[in-house]
Amino acid sequence: MLGDTTLKQLKDEISTLEYERYIKQLRYDEEASRTDLAVYIAPNQFIANWVKTKYGERLAHLFELSTGIRPKIEIRLGSLKKDVKSSSPKAGVSKGQKSTILNPSFTFDSFVVGNSNRFAYEVSQNVAKKQGIAYNPLLIYGGTGLGKTHLLNSIGNYNVAKGKSVIYVTSEQFLNDYLYHIRNNTMDRFRDKYRACDYLLIDDVQFFGGKPQIQEEFFHTFNELHNKNKQIVLTSDKTPKQIAGLEERLKSRFEWGMVSDIQPPELETKINIIKKKCEFDGIYLSNEIISYIATNMDNNIREIEGIIIKLNAYANLMNQEITLQFAKNVLKEQIKEERENITLENIIEVVSKELNVKPAEIKSKGRSKNIANARRIVIFLARTLTPNSMPSLAQFFGMKDHSSVSKAMKTVKTEIEEDANFKMVIEELKNKIKSRN
């Protein structure tokens, strides 16, 4: 296969160490690839990111040298075993038409459930077990990296194991597939593929916004599947009503079944996610390190998991044990970037909303209990989440000197140590602030 030949060509251009560690871990996905798209499967996000960033352009060039066409290079996550398919062959869905591969590690068992995602998890399980009966369609919405794709794959993997026909694609892949069949005058094959499955799973459906041609095609696909009691599951970064450029008839249909959100994970859930990831990958991190990562990184689960892989990779490359100091050194730039992205105004906005105190009151010299408490919390969070110094905060709040800031910090720290509920409030405020950036 050309994809494998291209990897062998790349082998001659790079070091043996790089080839063994990264390129050798890839598998060319012939079924998902086309003349304008070359798809490789990687075992984890770290390798996928590394190959895409460092070798993506070179791989595209090597393809171009052989075929005269420069394809888009996609690195997807999945099993390296060649017999893993995204759906079971059934009449009308031929084996050669599978558009992508489900991530075998994304199952209901590997999904970490917390207050932030419990409802979406329960609804997804219900839909997986009751095709076209429980909620059809199911649309899960929420920010990037919160677990929407994990649940989508979980539904797919559960039903593949049951012998069901499953198609899982991103909305961009659906569009590219549509354009490919339009160009080749094979729309009958496209419709056979997407309208003859038991489960149609589409990720990031907000991508359809502003694209009337693909919306028209999907409208008819949706209707045919729904009329046959076939299950449709969609994800989006916003509610149907918030998707700009989406036709009203599709917005209406997306709300026919169930619309469920996923919120940023609370601290306890983040800790459990890290522990689960470490257990799955056979990586040991102390509770101290796990707590450090959960507290200092944002709420994007995908990024948190990538950090764990990065830590482990650095430790292996440098032949070092992962200690707290080692973790701090490896992650310091990412944490610095996190802190620089959060502003004092962001913090004031969130705290004022959650504690029901006006932003102007927090910035004032008002001394009522509620206002003073909110101001102390803002100061504590600003020192924790941003690069603001104590003198700069004292100046912002019109205090005499930074000793007043130090006193506010000490008061909040003491209350955190003595009151578990207050500590939880602070952690939730941190999460809400980080999720806005």
Swiss-Prot record:
Residues 101-315 are annotated as: Domain III, AAA+ region. Residues 1-69 are annotated as: Domain I, interacts with DnaA modulators. It holds the Pfam family DnaA_N. Residues 69-100 are annotated as: Domain II. Disulfide bonds: none annotated. PANTHER family: CHROMOSOMAL REPLICATION INITIATOR PROTEIN DNAA. This is Chromosomal replication initiator protein DnaA. It comes from Wolinella succinogenes (strain ATCC 29543 / DSM 1740 / CCUG 13145 / JCM 31913 / LMG 7466 / NCTC 11488 / FDC 602W) (Vibrio succinogenes). The lineage of its organism: Bacteria, Pseudomonadati, Campylobacterota, Epsilonproteobacteria, Campylobacterales. The gene is dnaA.
